[in-house]
Every structure is written in C-alpha cells, then in structure tokens.
Amino acid sequence: MSISESSPAATSLPNGDCGRPRARSGGNRVTVVLGAQWGDEGKGKVVDLLAQDADIVCRCQGGNNAGHTVVVDSVEYDFHLLPSGIINPNVTAFIGNGVVIHLPGLFEEAEKNVQKGKGLDGWEKRLIISDRAHIVFDFHQAADGIQEQQRQEQAGKNLGTTKKGIGPVYSSKAARSGLRMCDLVSDFDGFSERFKVLANQYKSIYPTLEIDIEGELQQLKGYMERIKPMVKDGVYFLYEALHGPPKKILVEGANAALLDIDFGTYPFVTSSNCTVGGVCTGLGMPPQNVGEVYGVVKAYTTRVGIGAFPTEQDNEIGELLQTRGREFGVTTGRKRRCGWLDLVSLKYAHMINGFTALALTKLDILDMFTEIKVGVAYKLDGETIPHFPANQEVLNKVEVQYKTLPGWNTDISNARTFKELPVNAQNYVRFIEDELQIPVKWIGVGKSRESMIQLF
C-alpha cells in the first residue's frame, strides 16, 4: 500500500506537505562576478569596485592560471590565485574547495604584491583556505608542459594551456589520486606516502619527467607550517557566514563562460566549471543563496591561445584593438586575439548563467572607430542557426552576421556619468542591452577604479 493512496499524512494538507517543518531558507546572498566571454574581460576591476564594502571575497574554481589586474592609488596589482578583493584591508578572502592551489605560486604572488604597495598588508591573517582544496605540485606543472609538447608533435597543435598544472591536477582529482590541503596539514607522514605514490605514477607515465621527491616534500613541509593557520573547514566557514549576521559576500569567478569545461569551446577550455554552477560546487553552498550574478563583458572580444573565434579580426582592425587595448595575457604575456563583440556567444553565456546585469568594460578602446560592428547571428550553410555550436569544426565554419553601428570618434576616458558619453556611445550600450535583454550596470572607460561609470 503506497503512502500516496492512503496515508493521512499525505492528504492532511492541501498542498501535499506532510506536516513536516520546512527547511529553514534565507540567509545572506552572495554576489557573483563572472566572465561572459573567453576571459580577460576586466572581472578584477568589477570585483575591486564591489569589494570596497564587502566582508568576504571568495574564489570558487581554477588556479593560478587566472589573471586579474587591479589598479589602486596608481599601483597595479596582479592576482592569479588570491581573490583580488583581498586588497581591501577589511575583507576576509576565502579560497574554496573548487580551487587548485600551487603553494609556491601563492606565496610568490602575495610577496610580489606586498612589495608594490600597502594593499596586501596583513594578508596572511585575512586569508582562509578550504581544507578540501586540491594541491598543485611542481610535477603537475611539468607534466602540463610535456602534454603540450606531445600534442604539438602528435597533432600539430596544442591546447595553449598556461602550463600551470591545472589540467593535470584536476585529472588527479577526478582519478581520486589527488592530495588536498587537509591531507597536508593533518598528517604529514601519510601525506608524504601518498605524494610519493602520485609522483611515481607521473614518472611512469612521463619517463622524461624529473621529480626531486625528497626535495619537494621538504619544501612542502615548510609551506605547511605557514599555511596551517589559514586552512579551515570551508563548508562550515561559509555556512556560518551565510546564516550569521548580515554580511556582504562576493564571489570572484576566474576564467570565463566560454572556457568552462562543460559549456566552453571544448577542447580549448580550462579544466573547471567557470559558470554559475561552479560557484555552488566550488564553495559548498546551496543555489538559493546565490543573489546577483554580474556578467563582465568587454566592449569587443578577445581570446588567448587557439580555438574557434567567429568574430576575430585578423587584420588592421584586430591589430588596432590589440594595441589600443594593450591586449597581453596577465599570466602568460601572450598577445590576445581581438575581434568585434559577439552577441551570439553572449546570449549563450546568459542562458547558462542567468546574468542579472552586465559590466561593459573597455568601451574607450573603441573611441577611434568611425563605425563599429557587432555580431548578431551565425549562419551555417546559408541558414541562420539559433544556437551556439558545441563542435569546434562547426563553430569555425559559421558565417557571422553583423550589425554596423556608427562610432563616436571622441575620447570618452574622462566621462563619469552615462550622460557625459557621446550619443553614439550611449546608443552602442543601449543596443547591447536591447539585444541581450540584460541591463548594463557599469561601463568601463579607463583603467582606474574611478573610470567605472555606474548606471543604477
């Protein structure tokens, strides 16, 4: 006899609620900042803006393959692994379980930024690291380089990775052979044994790989002493933050939607989920605590490394965008490929992430153009397609349909309100809003914190 047929508990309430108390909902909401293109959109600047009155700033995925630049008081800080919001002295920075951590890289990054200015004073007391975060070892990075070399030799092309060990460490994680922060700080003898097993596995897979096992363990022991006070139960920490007194919690996404391991232009992607779902799995929090989701969009499009790029301008236009925008990767120093804004890919990113508003950055880079093109549709074999193709070969074949808008030929870098922008610049912003059906909340017209125009 089934409950649905005869149990009074199933029928006692009109809504089918069996009389049990509902789980407590509510709590603080997190504000999420995500890249909506192929990275390098200016997420760091938006985070810097929001972090000024934040209590906690989180990283939920990726490693030191990401690159964020923040300019404060004319000092340029570069972040790869640390949440860039840590530059606010009142912020607690949290690195979640979805992040992969190269300890030498973490301390090197912190020390370089400490030398630049006062932004990172006391950072070690303001950083919390999830005990469930996986560790990137030097041999992961070495293996990354060997894999790229093998791809080049075998297929004539590589993935264009940053060689920071991100793919190999996420592979170790999925294969359940990886090591986590909790292993390092809880039982170093047990950690050492597992480290040796993993290192020897890598040596058997890559015979040319040289690993100084004892030397690296000695180095890791030194890092363990420094890192131990920062390592906490991340799930408990965040739960307390979400359900305690009111707090402003900010999540800083790394990489971007089109680099997501599932939804990006696979295989030319990163190895983590950099869309909104990665926020919940990478921090250990339920989706009902996600509040605003801000997508960061460059006023044109760039991409580092190889992979399909429908609106790319491999010509004087692309060169002008590259030069004016100073489009070099923060992590690798590689030139970024440049092209027109692609609304097809942005609509796709919105379908996945549900952006509540956009930050449109680097609008000033378009100042010199008499006309500006925007990709509004893809055609394949002469027919418009309603979706963003999953297959790279198909994406490489699409013909982009453009809408041409008049430029403004005016320096807009001193504009501080929307009304101060030329009419054609205003129209460009409104066109993007109308096409995507997402409001633009900020417009970037320069590098500094002050050059972000807020619309609402």
UniProtKB/Swiss-Prot annotation:
Physiological role: Plays an important role in the de novo pathway and in the salvage pathway of purine nucleotide biosynthesis. Catalyzes the first committed step in the biosynthesis of AMP from IMP.
Location in the cell: Cytoplasm; Mitochondrion
PANTHER family associated with the record: ADENYLOSUCCINATE SYNTHETASE (PTHR11846), ADENYLOSUCCINATE SYNTHETASE ISOZYME 2 (PTHR11846:SF13)
Necessary cofactors: Mg(2+)
UniProt cross-references to SMART domains, sorted A to Z: Adenylsucc_synt (SM00788)
Binding site for Mg(2+): 40, 67
Mitochondrion listed as a keyword: yes
GO molecular function, one term: adenylosuccinate synthase activity
Name this protein carries in UniProt: Adenylosuccinate synthetase isozyme 2
GO cellular component: cytosol; mitochondrion
Activity control, per UniProt: Inhibited competitively by AMP and IMP and non-competitively by fructose 1,6-bisphosphate.
Active-site feature positions: 40, 68
Note describing how the cofactor binds: Binds 1 Mg(2+) ion per subunit.
Catalytic activity entry: IMP + L-aspartate + GTP = N(6)-(1,2-dicarboxyethyl)-AMP + GDP + phosphate + 2 H(+)
Biased composition (Polar residues): 1-14
Residues noted as binding IMP in the record, renumbered to the chain: 40-43, 65-68, 162, 176, 255, 270, 334
Residues bound to substrate: 40, 330-336
Subunit structure: Homodimer.
GO terms classed as biological process: 'de novo' AMP biosynthetic process; AMP biosynthetic process; AMP salvage; aspartate metabolic process; cellular response to electrical stimulus; IMP metabolic process; purine nucleotide biosynthetic process; response to ammonium ion
Highest rank taxon of the organism: Eukaryota
Activity-pH behavior: Optimum pH is 6.6-6.9.
